[in-house]
């Protein structure tokens, strides 16, 4: 023993709690004795809560941190009975669990074996009554632990729930209390001074302070009432000067201020209290301007009337009462300038990349300014904020070195106003200048904003000015030229270009319509592509090559979508134009080509994302594409290509794309979308053409998406037969993979798919089902096992699991019926090496309840156990033809248990004699066989323990390696992956153990039968001795009978009584001798039949073992090699 009490002579398990329970040499001593006894007696009624191994090794009990000596959690796990009992939960049928009434919510309250309570709900465990603190721990995994110790039943499995913390908490993983105290809750409530000043309005003050509302509500109601004759001017639609409207508003504002003043006068009701209240508010918010709040309150209540008056005045151009109410931007003017381009406004920007920047600013500014037309914008401050934001968008310098001067700003603002097409924009500006709180002239920036808009209005208010005429003419020329492109009028375009060439030659003016771009930033070249006008596109490029420089072409893009010419050409599928653009791109440097191809649009997509429109282009530009670049949906170009399910040449598309992508540096994980789908998940067909499965590394064929679907389950779910066939042949495939969320396996998805398929898809579904079942029978089941269990569901009416069998016969049976058939078989064949029902179903007792999260997982293991049972039956010589009949899986009915017992008894009562010599031979044979079987059993038990421990230690090794990598990343200031606490996976040893345990169970069964017969032999000898003794006594009576024969008719009464007593004694001896002789005959018959049966079963055992062990090794090799292939270790030399 080590100093700390832990065993030093056994292979320690890395998790201290599991090591204490399953690998404890002191299990028969306190404090472990009672715990071990409870677990051993009803191991299926308990579930062990397992904290992370690293946490137990490296953390302390939080309660001990305040004391002078800290207590490590691993010491509690080894020595503290309460800690151990607190992590063992009663989940059996007698655990008194309170389940949630809603089935979708997996929640239940359970008691630990020390009387504490936990709540299991929605993947979390919450500590409750009895625990020192209210904590919560996340459930990270569940599983079964195969026991290998001698003090638990052989082959027993214990349910484990893995969590991310201990139920005592830990020093490295602090958890807050579930419910805050009332004081803490009160502290979270915002105090008045925490309310932002900007969010305070006068209306809010009225709601929050009833005293203030009581003082001013009635006067304000009268002020804003429609019958208020004093301000009737605002309610009559007559032509009037704008100053009159402004004056009426000012008067109402003064009335509002007076209402506030009157409310705080000492002679008014509650005046003093109202005054004190307002002073208290102002002290709490020193930055609050009460006059501003009142102004905004009046403005909100009068907005509808004010705005209606302004609209009426600005609409009456024929009978204007005020020159300031002139409507400049009419619908006609907007139409006249609708095609105006930025290059035609004397903006000193020639570089195409800077022009793109300005066009994008204009587009964003148009969106912002268009908010003025929103009917919910009813305050001058909101309107001012909109035009202020518009100016800020145009002048921002965050991503550009371009400086915007005043003249440039006016030009940009003209574009914004003209293309936003806001009706009555003049009224909006007038409202801002005349109805806002304060004076604009006091703020220099606001004055600059307003003056900028005034300048735009001035420039566009004089249609007779040459500047406006030029803009109108330019807009008209743009419209006519773009219309020619869209209508494919090549002859007219040719004549127009010839005329332009004669007029300007190589040097086009900056404001020429050939260089014009619409509000989306689309040039004539872009419009030609959009309209699929190849002739015009070629004509524009070839008429005079000096008109469009290489920079003009490379930076020609739709500024709203950021799509360049090549992207649009691919989208429009204009292959000839695409080819021309590729030729032009070939004249650039390699760096320029890569930058152009991988520049992204508004959705984050590059040219590579659109190559599926012309997949032959991949061979030319594939080497330039960044295939790992993700768009906003996390699609890489390769991922996007694979999703083109309706492509006319999908196979060629996939083959071409993967031939360009696949290389030794190909990273499979990079091509995953935000839902966790890999390329294998979304590939419709052509998996062989892709060559993905031929890659030696980086390909995880078992990866799951956010819905816990693997590529295999996706192919089954969506009927992708071609991919399914190819994937089933891959050595890395985990065919029986179960997701960690619902524990569905491939057979569940086959069942789901079969139920969802309609009549048209039924043939496809049946074909998929056939492939899945055939693969399972080929790789997981021996040839002679023709029927296995695939699915099950719980029947609430029968309170039993209904099992679905598939094979030569498709049968549905209840689990209880299967167990009864097994029991009947054992009654009929008491000496069969097939174990008893209790041994086979040791871990799955009848009516055994488990935690809700364990239900599906436990059912999967039960089906697994049932199939292994069927496999073992198929390897028994007596069941070569139909092993499934043993469990009642045949069409013929089984006889009852009573009939089976009568048949066995009748067989045993048949006459048969065994001589002592024969008996000695039988005894010698059985004794020698028992000795050999015990030696084999001892070796088998050791081997099974080794298999179990080996699988656990492999998991421990992997856990230690992950913990080491986590610590190393923390030391290197890297972002480590989240530490996990998962169930030990199967490294192949668990699979081998599941079959080798049957060798152990059959040996135990044969030895038990041998011991039973040896006991019968002892009974036979004792009975034989009694028969000989009784026969000797009978001979003595018969000899004395002749001596007493002469006195038989004596009249002496006393002498006659003696003779009568001897006769009675003689009769009793005869009867006793007859009974013992009959019993001896039965024993002889039973021993002979049992001997023959056991001898046959020993022969069957040798044949059974010779078949089972190679099959078990084959399954071990399959699981182990699958893991090696999955991890890429098969390439190591």
Curated annotation (Swiss-Prot):
Domain of life per record: Eukaryota
GO cellular component, one term: tubular endosome
One biological process term in Gene Ontology: early endosome to late endosome transport
MF annotations from Gene Ontology: guanyl-nucleotide exchange factor activity; SNARE binding
Residue ranges annotated for the VPS9 domain, each copy included: 324-469
Gene3D superfamilies per UniProt: Ankyrin repeat-containing domain, VPS9 domain
Pfam families membership: VPS9 (PF02204)
Stated family: Belongs to the UPF0507 family.
Protein name: UPF0507 protein PGUG_02975
